[in-house]
From Swiss-Prot:
Its cofactor is Mg(2+). This is Phosphoenolpyruvate carboxylase. The active site is at 139, 544. It comes from Marinobacter nauticus (strain ATCC 700491 / DSM 11845 / VT8) (Marinobacter aquaeolei). It comes from the Bacteria. One of its GO terms (biological process) is oxaloacetate metabolic process.
């Protein structure tokens, strides 16, 4: 087993010691001793020392209500500090540890592509045309409070400063003192949110990720891309090219979230402009100090006359307009009268003066100055624009159909919802080709329809740079897309917006290619979309609907066929991947996922959701963000120029054979076994999850109901908390078992060797199985389940999990899980003694919580400690839902 890197081990030890000092100061020695005793017992239990498990459970059982909270908080804080140390270690560039970075450089990938026969001109063209868009979403998975995240970020900065070998003893002591203070502040800060964030709060957090990290990271990354591209092809990155885009669902995603109204969306658009103006003002102030030179081109002189400081004069005018823009946005947010004269609204208002200065400096031979901070600001302006972030709108298809139906009914044209698809399309295309407004002025729509129309009006008032995609969930036919375009036109939309159908259930994925072919058959629409189309693939719901193996295969086939259909109609397709942080929701290492997409499906453009806590893990610190941007960019370029081979027909047959068995066995348990939902409710903390104020979105679509009413995120969260990890392996166990019985494992090994898609699936399954824990799952059952039928189901599921592990080891010809991932294996080994006590405590607290609820009152300390265990286990697992 690979040990932790000495530097990482030293950082974990330092942070743990400083946390211990905080605990010694408060609550004091007795509590500290109790925590140490529990930690020692948990370590002994993991070493399988005789009687240590019973001793651990006994120690935890003896905790009084008053001791519960400090003990759970101590283990939660340690796991957060361990995450922090690991996250920092991933970006450490300390001399002698180049392997720590674990990301292939842009130059290495470009060289490999050229060695493989890619022409440098083709490489340059593909990079210049690259379009990678990250869509930040606030799914309720980020457990850590923003207050603490800021403290953790500064702790990471302290670790970075400690990495300098030339520190004087006094300097080192000063940094350690600051670290000690930050850890003490974190220890005395309540780590649990007690009120749900609003949709606007979530959007502000998205803006904060840009301000604190991406604002610095993006120009740094683009400099590196420019240099590597220039070295590889002889040409740098064109000035106006922005291969990276940042979009967001925070404040725009109203699907299943009644808290996101048109007022919220309008406020988020305005807040984005306010924040952007503020950030650009800081840049312009710094540039005014830099650009003091007097040489200028005739073009610039024509703009400013004989000024001795022509650049400063241009920047002073820009500064005045940015101040006006910020004041206008602030007044508009508050609902006060706002003067919009002289504000910056279109992107050219910002990029024009900056590029004028750039051209002048280049013409005067001042390239070094032109390519300094001015270039960084221009790159930011082309990436973030004046709106700062591109806001997506998401709404369910039936809401648009109902709006059109009310309109049609009011005009006396018939019952739209009873029309056939062909009748709907004929009506919509006729209206879209015409010029007349459809909505009469005196019409009074119902409240739900009024809200849909008001949202369309807010969207129509934006510039193209402020908008991402209009995503339609539950879309299945061309009229679903045409409804939205008509409603936007009625609202006054002056330019075509991307309208994106989302396919997420198994049936949706299977029907997606035919649905898109029918849409491309509409001549008017092909002209509207100008040969470009985006389609969203949902990973979470398909996995919950069909099990992970069937979902992964359905997603792969849908992407293949969608690409074929788009090519047939001469349409450039961008696939928008609605992935989560966990394997059960399509998560996993990004570069592996991209490189295992069907050949031809990436094609220079890639759009992906970054959800909840994964935003922090990937983009939370500037150096981390540069690393993530590099990783995605190299993978997208490679998948575009050197895609994986087309899978053999016999491999497809094997996948059909496997998934037929996995789907049947998954649904037999999840859909058809009457004991399953009661078992799920009793053995997991699902019902208590509603108490965690995680996000603005309700955890359920309906107040009651089975698994289908539960959102995909709490569904995964609940199983992760008690370590059965069921959504990610159920069904695969039977498929692998029957493959072994049919002597088909050699075929599967051949597929692993030659097919990145299948290899990635098997590797992700192994990672999930390594996080599962049979003993802990069994303890939850013993503590929380009494019904014999439910206990029998639990025993059967645990036996199936054990069987899945055995079959996977046989397939990979390994003795233990994660043999080829020693760093990850050791990370889990280090975390387990800290996570185990939280699991045992959580099961006990759930029991007390349920008993107290039955008696009518849950003690506050029990409820708070229960919330802390959920947060701590999430930190230990490095993900939630």
């Amino acid at each position: 087993m690979t040990e932790l890197h000495p530097d990482l081990r030293e950082n974990v030890r330092l942070l743990g010691d400083l946390l211990g000092q905080s605990i010694l100061r408060f609550p004091g020695q007795d509590c500290y001793d109790r925590i140490e005793e529990i930690r020692a017992a948990a370590k002994a239990d993991r070493r399988q020392e005789s009687g240590s498990g019973q001793r651990l459970v006994k120690l935890l059982g003896q905790l009084s209500d008053d001791e519960l909270l400090p003990v759970t908080r101590a283990f939660n804080q340690f796991l957060n500090l361990a995450n922090l140390a690991e996250q920092y270690h991933g970006i450490r560039r300390k001399q002698g540890h180049p392997s720590d970075l674990m990301v292939e450089s842009l130059g290495e990938v470009f060289d490999r592509l050229k060695s493989g026969g890619i022409d440098p001109q083709e490489l340059h063209r593909k990079v210049a045309d690259l379009r990678i868009e990250f869509v930040l979403t606030a799914h309720p998975t980020e457990v850590a409070r923003r207050t603490l995240i800021l403290k953790y970020d500064e702790m990471s900065d302290c670790l970075s400063r400690l990495d300098h070998d030339d520190l004087m003893p006094g300097e080192r002591e000063e940094i350690v003192d600051r670290l000690s203070l930050l850890i003490a502040e974190a220890w005395h800060t309540d780590e649990i949110r007690h009120e749900r964030p609003t949709a606007v709060d979530e959007a502000k957090w998205g803006f904060a990720v840009i301000e604190n990290s991406l604002w610095q990271a993006l120009p740094k990354f683009l400099r590196s891309l420019d240099t590597s591209l220039s070295e590889a092809t002889g040409q740098g990155l064109p000035l106006q090219v922005s291969p990276i885009r940042i979009a967001s669902w925070m404040g725009g995603d109203r699907d299943g979230n009644p808290n996101v109204t048109h007022e919220v969306t309008r406020e988020v658009f305005l807040l984005g402009r306010w924040m952007a103006a503020d950030l650009y003002l800081r840049d312009i102030q710094a540039l005014r100090a830099e650009l003091s030179m007097w040489q200028a081109s005739d073009e610039l002189r024509a703009e400013v006359g004989d000024s001795r400081e022509p650049y400063r004069q241009v920047l002073a005018q820009l500064r005045e307009r940015l101040i006006k823009t910020r004041e206008w946005a602030e007044a508009s947010v508050k609902g006060e009268p706002a003067d919009d004269s002289g504000i910056l609204f279109e992107n050219e208002d910002l990029t024009g003066p900056l590029e004028l200065c750039y051209r002048s400096l280049m013409e005067c031979g001042l390239e070094t100055i032109a390519n300094g901070p001015l270039l960084d600001t221009i790159r930011r302006a082309h990436t973030f624009g004046l709106p700062l972030i591109r806001l997506d709108i998401r709404q369910e298809a039936s809401r648009h159909a109902e709006a059109v139906a009310e309109m049609v009914n009011y005009l006396g044209l018939g019952d739209y919802l009873s029309w056939s698809e062909q009748e709907r399309q004929a009506f919509l295309v006729k209206e879209l080709k015409g010029r007349r407004p459809l909505v009469p002025r005196n019409w009074q729509p119902s409240e739900p329809v009024r809200e849909v129309l008001a949202t369309c009006e807010v969207v129509a008032g934006q510039t193209p740079e402020a908008l991402g995609s209009y995503v339609i969930s539950m879309a299945s036919k061309p009229s679903d897309v045409l409804n939205v375009i008509l409603l936007l036109r009625e609202a006054g939309m002056a330019f075509p917006m991307r309208v994106v159908p989302l396919f997420e259930t198994l049936d949706d994925l299977k029907g997606a290619p035919d649905s898109m072919a029918a849409l491309y058959e509409v001549d008017w629409y092909r002209e509207y979309c100008s040969g470009r189309q985006e389609v969203m693939i949902g990973y979470s719901d398909s996995s919950k609907d069909a099990g992970q193996l069937m979902a992964a295969w359905a997603q792969y086939q849908a992407q293949e066929k969608l690409t074929e259909v788009a090519n047939r109609y001469g349409v450039h397709l961008t696939l928008f991947h609605g992935r989560g942080g966990t394997v059960g929701r399509g998560g996993g290492p990004a570069n592996r996922a991209i490189l295992s997409q069907p050949p031809g499906s990436v094609n220079g453009s890639f759009r992906i959701t970054e959800q909840g806590e994964m935003i922090r893990f990937k983009f939370g610190l500037p150096r981390l963000a540069v690393q993530s941007l590099t990783l995605y960019t190299t993978a997208v370029i490679e998948a575009t120029l050197a895609p994986p081979p087309v899978p053999k027909d016999e491999w497809r047959e094997v996948m059909d054979w496997l998934t037929e068995r996995s789907l049947r066995s998954y649904r037999e348990v999840v859909r058809e076994n009457p004991d399953f939902v009661p078992y799920f409710r009793q053995v997991t903390p699902e019902t208590a999850l509603g108490k965690l104020a995680l996000g603005s979105r309700p955890a359920r679509r309906k107040a009651t109901g089975g698994v289908e009413s539960l959102r995909a995120i709490p569904w995964i969260f609940a199983w992760t908390q008690m370590r059965l990890m069921l959504p990610s392996w159920l069904g695969s166990d039977v498929a692998l078992e029957q493959a072994a019985q049919a002597d088909r494992l050699p075929e599967l090994r051949e597929m692993m060797q030659g097919w990145p898609f299948f290899r990635t699936y098997v590797d992700m399954l192994e990672m999930v199985l390594a996080k599962a824990d049979l003993r802990i799952a069994s303890y939850y059952e013993q503590t929380l389940v009494e019904d014999e039928h439910l206990l029998a189901l639990g025993q059967s599921l645990r036996q199936r999990l054990q069987g899945c592990i055995e079959r996977l080891l046989e397939l990979k010809q390994q003795q233990t899980l994660l043999e080829q991932e020693p760093v990850f294996a050791h990370s889990m080994k280090v975390r387990n003694p800290y996570t185990d006590p939280l699991h045992y405590l959580q099961a006990e607290l759930l029991r007390r919580d349920r008993e107290s609820e039955g008696a009518g009152k849950v003690p506050e300390l029990v409820e708070r400690a229960l919330k802390v265990t959920m947060a701590g286990i999430s930190a230990g697992m490095r993900n939630t839902g």
